[in-house]
Amino acid sequence: MKKFNEKVSGMSASPIDVQESELRLFPGLDDEVAATLRALKASAAGERPRLVDTTMLFAPRSGGVKRYLLSKKAWLADHRPDVAHSLVVPGAGYKASLDGIVRLQAAKLPFGDGYRWPSSVRRWGAWVSSLNPTLIEAGDPYTPGQGALEAGQRVGCPVVGFCHSDPAALAALHFGEWAKKPVEKRWAKLFSQFDRVVSPSRFIAQRLEEAGVGGILIRPLGVEVDTFHPDRRDRDWLLKKLGLGADARLLCFAGRPAKEKNVGVLIDAVQRLGAPYHLVLVGAGAGMPPEDRVISLPYEKDPRAVARIIASCDAFVHANDKEPFGLIVLEAMACGRAVVGVNAGGVAETVDESVGQLAASADPIDYAEAIEALFARDVEALGQAARVKAVEQFAWSRVFEDLTMLYGELTGKAEFVTPQEVLPIN
């Protein structure tokens, strides 16, 4: 870990002068680049301390990381107005929006469900530097994460690495066990360079420690408890939409159609159980052939629409046994739904018998048994307990208060920390 106190003391007092020649091979030939750089330099001239979040895990259909970042942006605007916040992510072109989201052109990943891969660490770091950040948070170990480290060195500001995924496990899943160790080595090398490493779960913290990264701070993610609310429940509406009778038991999963989500386990388990169970897939069934007892609904961009579907089902199901955290599980709990998970990964740290049921493994037989065990209990009472737990332990306000304390510690800037209440003198 770097000595961030030394970096803070050496932070630049004036904006870093990033030239267009650092961003394009032939400067002056791209109006989008020039306009975006001017906009970033103008915003960097302000006096407020600036937090810059950057990641490639931000796509039109991406899930937890994107919702975390957008929720943080909204919370900072409401509760830390003296802090400027920019979000630097890949896009189809170059654009700096008034809401503080900066999109930098990057190529789409083949079969990547809309994700884009920036090609140049040096250029990404230059773009982030142009914002003159007080603090940078990197949300991945890829080009943006590496660029964040370069920008931190150039500007002289601390850089936080928030570990939202386990790329070594993903490499093993998609390419075989041979790919795990090389990726793990690069992952550990990068995260060892951050001034502070944050993990959303003990599961990911342990994986980082196994890879050789130390000094990890565990900070769970949160949930928008007003958006994801039991009041959105309308079971009759959903049954009519699905063409099912009142005796149906609706199990919901919402997420990307990614291999690690183990959607096949959910399908096999429901088909083993048979009537009256039905699996409702929101977004996760894209591209799949029709399956008995499985209903695929399209991806929903509006969180309120997702909340309405989840709240209107009877239980939420999640079979990823290597999930780093599982933000969608919290959202289901906030909707007042009991959850069936797997006794492994980050989900097992959120779900217990007080709010749902854990399968012994991500095996269809074990998972089917867990579903049956859940419905042998008082599912509605479990859902009410899930709502209470989500509100009391995982509301975004609590999560971001903790994070901004860390930001204040790293930067020495009081604007990140809640000001003390001034009491009137009688």
Residue ranges, per PLM feature:
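Short hydrophobic beta-strand element within catalytic cores of glycosyltransferases
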Residues: A338-G341
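Conserved donor-binding/catalytic core segment of Leloir-type glycosyltransferases
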Residues: V52-T54, G245-K261, I267-Q271
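Short alpha-helical donor nucleotide-sugar binding micro-motif in glycosyltransferases
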Residues: R308-C313
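Donor nucleotide-sugar binding/catalytic pocket of nucleotide-sugar-dependent glycosyltransferases
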Residues: E20-D30, K185-D234
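Aromatic "clamp/platform" in nucleotide-sugar-dependent glycosyltransferases that forms part
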Residues: D321
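Conserved acidic donor-binding segment of nucleotide-sugar-dependent glycosyltransferases
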Residues: Y299, E353-P364, A373-D378
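Nucleotide-sugar donor phosphate/pyrophosphate-binding loop at the beta->alpha transition
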Residues: P158-V160, A168-K189
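N-terminal subdomain of nucleotide-sugar transferases
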Residues: K2-G93, D99, Q271
